[in-house]
A protein has these predicted regions:
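Charge-dense, helix-prone N-terminal extensions
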Residues: 1-124
C-alpha cells in the first residue's frame, strides 16, 4: 500500500493564512495531515491521500452538501459526517473560494459569539 505524503509546508502556509484569523482556532496534527479546530469541533483537515493527491475537508450547510457532491471533482462527499465536504487541492485550486468555504465552515462550527466576530465573504 502506498504511503500517504506529508502535507507540503507551502500548502500548510496557504491554509494557515485563512484559518489563523478565526478567533480561538487551533491547529493540531491529525492521524494523517493537519486539522484546525474551534474547541472540539473540526473546521478543516488537510491531508495527503495514498494516491498522492492532497485534499482538504470542511463543514458545509446541509443544503450545500448535495450540491458539492453533484459538482463532482474537485469536490467530494465524505463517508463521515453528514455535513462534511472535501476538495482536492492542486495548482488549479481557487484559493478565494476555499477561503469562503473555510470561513463558512468555521461559522458553522464555532459558538455564535465567536462566529459573529468573523466577516463572511459577500456572495455576488
Amino acid at each position: 500500500m502506498p504511503e500517504r505524503p506529508d502535507v507540503p509546508a507551502a500548502l500548510l502556509r496557504r491554509v494557515r493564512k485563512v484559518v489563523d484569523r478565526f478567533p480561538e482556532c487551533t491547529e493540531q496534527d491529525a492521524w494523517i495531515g493537519v486539522c484546525w479546530r474551534i474547541r472540539q469541533a473540526t473546521i478543516a483537515h488537510v491531508f495527503g491521500g495514498e494516491d498522492q493527491i492532497f485534499r482538504i475537508t470542511f463543514r458545509a450547510e446541509p443544503a450545500e452538501v448535495a450540491a458539492f457532491e453533484h459538482l463532482g471533482p474537485p469536490y467530494f462527499k465524505t463517508d463521515w459526517g453528514s455535513n462534511v465536504v472535501g476538495l482536492m487541492l492542486d495548482r488549479d485550486t481557487d484559493w478565494r473560494e476555499l477561503r469562503e468555504l473555510l470561513t463558512d465552515s468555521y461559522c458553522l462550527q464555532a459558538p455564535m459569539k465567536l462566529a459573529s466576530q468573523v466577516a463572511r465573504p459577500q456572495v455576488p
